[in-house]
């Protein structure tokens, strides 16, 4: 299994969404891990973006982990709870504090909000 990684797509910005509409990203993996800052969780248009159709067609599985920007735009971190899953397509989903097994590989998907950083 080949794993491809991306982060910080920021699809909440029209310029980024427009760019991806006309500039297809290279597909180099079977599984795509999107590690945070993809779109605002409260954005009602985000789940129907063309990007998810593309991801659905090009990857066996797309695993999305929320980053800090997912909670921007007045979204309460604890509103969804400590552990949750939100499927955008059959093979495309957000995972918070979840383990997903694909073949013989376990993906531990979590974002530690408010982690202490030493100075």
Feature names for model-found ranges:
Residues 18-23, 67, 104-106, 119:
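Generic alpha-helix signal with a bias toward terminal, lower-confidence helices
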Residues 1-63, 71-76:
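N-terminal active-site segment of His-dependent metallophosphoesterases
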Residues 9-10, 69, 99, 112:
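Active-site beta-loop-alpha junctions enriched in small/polar residues
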């Amino acid at each position: 299994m080949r794993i491809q990684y991306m982060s910080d797509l920021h699809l909440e910005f029209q310029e980024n969404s427009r760019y991806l509409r006309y500039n297809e990203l290279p597909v180099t993996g079977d599984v795509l891990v999107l590690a945070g800052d993809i779109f605002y969780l409260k954005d009602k248009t985000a789940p129907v973006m063309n990007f998810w159709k593309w991801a659905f067609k090009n990857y066996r599985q797309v695993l999305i982990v929320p980053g800090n920007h997912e909670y921007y735009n007045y979204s309460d971190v604890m509103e969804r709870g400590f552990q949750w899953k939100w499927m955008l397509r059959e093979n495309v989903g957000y995972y918070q504090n979840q383990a997903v097994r694909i073949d013989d590989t376990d993906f531990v998907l979590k974002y530690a909000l408010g982690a202490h950083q030493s100075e």
